[in-house]
């Protein structure tokens, strides 16, 4: 959908609500919609899973099309990595984030630094996935906000050519949201517990899970 079509669609929605919505500016609302493209973690998981399937097919066709998964343990770290990658390479294509179990155990547990043996909190990794995507969505909102300001400046200057160029860039904007491969520890209980943890991670936005059991001994009752 074009930038103008987004505005027109929003104008129709506002008009259909009558006078209570009259103070809402259609273009401002359309911009907020573009800055908040992903509403839920499942929206992200579906979007990134499609990317990953395409990248796997591209690699099968030619191994030169490999992907790179960069480890991170904090939303800000992931955000700055993707901002830097996009600025340097001009794209985030075939660049993923990877959550390592040992890294999470060592750096993100409320109990402090721990070995990678199922000793950290069960929901630590899902919480980190959600945190990462919050920061990546913020990077999108910031960059699009700068583009909107540039568009307003071009219009005020009467530079129709520059305004059109910026509109085209907005319509073809590449998000900082990339696939996350998450290391899931199956050592927290039985198969159902592993299923529930995997479900939680997908709901947070992960599109690929690496499942392993790092427990050092048998969990027993009594």
Predicted regions and their residues:
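Alpha/beta enzyme core
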Residues: 2-222
